[in-house]
């Protein structure tokens, strides 16, 4: 075997190792980036309750924007993902009231600051379910309700939700495909 053949084989071996190292590094970087995005920017959420029925059904898959409330304040009407001490499970609810707002419920309807809410998305009537109304939301808290009002575990039972428990905002439905689109 000539010296050129030995050098050629060593070169091929080094090339193969370099190629493997580059692949491992590339795949590792992709996994790290995907995990960072999943944990800190956008995530997938699955609807597991019927409390948003009419708007969201069990089994729907959503894209959650976890940066929404880092750069801006929550807004009335947002569909929020809640993960905090208020509940043992992650919840998906509609944000109804912000700090300083007064919530009232009369004759199955919701009133916000004395004005009846127009809620085309709401299914069923809304009763206080043990909540003393009218009720004023404290600073750093929000009031949430499920759209399926008669079958929802929400602020009527749990109390207000801390800003810190708002994991993110549901922005896009990705499953089922025929319902793909922005969530309102």
Listing of model-derived features with the role each one plays in the protein:
Residues 2-20, 25, 36, 40-46, ...:
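Soluble "head" domains of membrane/secretory-pathway proteins
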